[in-house]
Amino acid sequence: MGGDYAPGPILEGCLEAIGRFPINIKFVGKIEKVKDAAEKTGLTELLENEIDNNRLELIDSGEPIGMNEEATTVRKRKNSSINVAMDLVRNNKAEAVYSAGNSGAMMASAIFRIGRLKGIDRPAIGALFPTRDQTRPVLVLDVGANTCLLYTSPSPRDTA
């Protein structure tokens, strides 16, 4: 449930997505904060309808990892919203995790709780970017590329 101004805008986006796509959402966060946000934004009735229709499920968690906190905080705060969400995927109770919160914490939690595919050292983070053609968004990946200098001794060919 992390993210700027969360949970209000996140809840609004989830409810809009449910209205537009054939998906069900497990909304992980402090339930009282989610319900308060729904009330403040006038979304209480819509939220309750989607819960009643089994399109949205509220799942209680501990405090989120803040945007300015170290990614490794996920190891200490076991019941954080990102850890609870990753556990849902690990236990085959969800297919994906979407977070508007701390990207480093999200990646750390995914690695610690779900693991990596064999041979993958640095998983990518993907984001859909809109285009002028609204039916064709573009998937942009942050693959964590680093620039490094390689120092090697000269080969025998170079000294001849």
Stretch-by-stretch model annotation:
Residues A6, L149-L150:
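Secondary-structure boundary/capping motif
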Residues I65-G66, P137-T147:
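A short small-residue
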Residues N83-V89, A127-P137, Y151-T152:
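Short, surface-exposed, charge-dense and proline/glycine-enriched linear segments
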Residues M1-A100, A105-F112:
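Contiguous, glycine/small-aliphatic-enriched amphipathic segments in soluble metabolic enzymes
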Residues Y151-A160:
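Single conserved hydrophobic/aromatic residue that forms the stacking wall/gate
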Residues S109-D142:
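Short, acidic/small-residue loops that bind anionic groups at enzyme active sites
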